[in-house]
């Protein structure tokens, strides 16, 4: 970061900063403009006072001009955001496609779009998980249609496992939510996880922000219930629902250990006809187990409710519980503190992804790095020493 940008970012005046490093404001102005280069002692003071944000390279090397950034038309950005706010599904879908893209020029465009987004604390973010066959899509569609009857706009982000060949979604939830997908007040988007368990977090969060900007009142995020994506989704929603089948035990359910512990609400689905009794038994078993564990979340005892998504039975009670849960979180301020934590998590996920992309695109192609890899292959260099050399190279050349 150049010194001028740092001072503006931190709200520090030239006069105040010049005083801190023991020089005149005139000298500092000359350093900032590039008219003069600071002496070594001054550069070290500047680096120390800025916690390394401004380093010697920022004085000796001019920053690279990002052509992708230069070509972005700010008027077109404003038009995109305006169209999203006015309810254009086409513009919304295009923006989410940009979010999912790995192309640098698309990511630069996304950054500019997001800078114009406003904070939205009115939307309710609902995570829904459960093993394949539990009826997640039917549940979301049935509840979503009921919410639309209440004049609410509903969106669904369905996290599909990705095809390793194409990187695209395998399941495609639009085919399983036929009524909801064609409703003018609904928006459904299958979202591929990118072939790795952690790939869901950043892209899904950013897609969710697009939906909030478009004015959707309720956003469902559906996951498979068999991997680490559940933890990532749990950390970006306001309430997390775990759907169960009318049968006993986590083992019989096929649920990954620990997912039940994430639940804010447990729903026994498919309480239809002959399975009504089994659903009630499962409900009582989990209620007893939760009572024994005695671990309330957000001041709530985790509730266990039953429903039939197919017959739209029990959904009103589930929605009532969600509203009470959200209102209580807002009253005790955990709703807003959680949203702040989610924002920080997004920031760190963005940092991790940027560094990973840097490593994958640049570091792995470098000739010096290839030599290190060959030495590791030939047992001439330890993994620890190779890691140290690569990290030093990355720090010197990329940061």
Predicted feature locations:
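Hydrophobic positions on the alpha1 helix immediately C-terminal to the Walker A/P-loop
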Residues: 139
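Canonical P-loop GTPase G-domain recognition
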Residues: 265, 271-328
């Amino acid at each position: 970061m150049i010194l001028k940008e740092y001072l503006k970012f931190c709200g520090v005046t030239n006069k105040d900063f010049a005083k801190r490093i023991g020089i005149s404001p005139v000298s500092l102005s000359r350093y900032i403009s590039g008219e003069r280069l600071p002496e070594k002692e001054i550069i070290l003071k500047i680096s120390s006072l800025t916690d390394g944000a401004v380093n010697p390279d920022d004085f000796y090397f001019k920053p690279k001009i990002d052509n992708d950034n230069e070509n972005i038309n700010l008027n077109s950005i404003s038009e995109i955001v305006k169209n999203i706010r006015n309810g254009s599904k086409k513009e919304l879908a295009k923006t989410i496609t940009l979010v999912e893209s790995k192309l640098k020029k698309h990511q630069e465009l996304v950054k500019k779009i997001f800078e114009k987004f406003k904070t939205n604390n009115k939307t309710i973010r609902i995570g829904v998980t459960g093993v394949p066959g539990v009826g997640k899509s039917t549940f979301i569609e049935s509840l979503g249609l009921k919410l639309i009857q209440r004049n609410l706009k509903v969106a669904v982000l369905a996290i599909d496992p990705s095809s390793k060949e194409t990187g695209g979604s395998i399941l495609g939830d639009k085919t399983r939510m036929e009524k909801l997908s064609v409703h003018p007040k609904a928006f459904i988007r299958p979202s591929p996880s990118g072939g790795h368990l952690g790939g869901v977090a950043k892209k899904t969060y950013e897609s969710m922000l697009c939906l909030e900007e478009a004015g959707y009142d309720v956003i469902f995020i559906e996951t498979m219930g068999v991997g680490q994506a559940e933890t990532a989704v749990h950390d970006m929603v306001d309430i997390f629902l775990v759907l169960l089948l009318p049968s006993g035990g986590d083992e019989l359910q096929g649920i990954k250990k620990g997912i039940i512990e994430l639940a804010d609400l447990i729903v026994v689905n498919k309480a239809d006809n002959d399975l009504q009794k089994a659903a009630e038994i499962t409900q009582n078993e989990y209620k007893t187990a939760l009572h024994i564990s005695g671990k309330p979340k957000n001041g709530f005892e985790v509730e266990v409710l039953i429903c039939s998504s197919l017959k739209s039975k029990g959904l009103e009670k589930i929605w009532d519980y969600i509203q009470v849960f959200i209102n209580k979180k807002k009253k005790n301020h955990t709703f807003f503190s959680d949203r702040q934590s989610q924002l920080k998590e997004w920031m760190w996920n963005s940092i991790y992804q940027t560094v990973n992309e840097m490593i994958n695109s640049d570091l792995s192609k470098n000739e010096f790095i290839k030599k290190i890899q060959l030495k590791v292959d030939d047992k001439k260099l330890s993994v620890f020493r190779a890691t140290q050399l690569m990290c030093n190279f990355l720090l010197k050349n990329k940061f």
